[in-house]
């Protein structure tokens, strides 16, 4: 459906994932199977679901996978806030990540709205 490297939303999600890997590298080793693993999994899920949706043959399926990616972004947002509250992640590191996530969520929503219009136009 789309070339991944041309999807700005996918590129931004990849960059976010790299940033999450970097910040979680400094988390306590006791969190290896906790917040480190959960945060990284949620982060990886975002571009992965965008990619899977883009590889599908319908706008409806793509829209569904964007919804899953968006859900993962909210999961990641929550995990990063928890890490901050537990003093594993300072505000200086947290705030840019939250801004990045917020921007990605807005882009995802906008993309979903565009796909929804295409889906509805096909029904006519």
Task: Locate the predicted segments by residue.
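Short, C-terminally biased terminal segments at protein or domain edges
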Residues: 1-124
């Amino acid at each position: 459906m789309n070339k991944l490297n041309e999807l700005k939303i996918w590129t931004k999600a990849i960059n976010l994932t790299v940033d999450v890997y970097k910040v979680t590298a400094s988390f306590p080793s006791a969190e290896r199977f906790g917040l480190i693993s959960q945060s990284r999994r949620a982060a990886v899920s975002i571009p992965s679901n965008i990619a899977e949706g883009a590889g599908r043959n319908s706008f409806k399926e793509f829209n569904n996978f964007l919804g899953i990616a968006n859900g993962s972004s909210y999961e990641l947002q929550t995990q990063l806030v928890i890490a901050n509250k537990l003093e594993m992640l300072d505000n200086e590191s947290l705030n840019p990540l939250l801004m990045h996530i917020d921007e990605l969520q807005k882009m995802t929503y906008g993309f979903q709205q565009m796909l929804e219009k295409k889906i509805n136009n096909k029904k006519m």
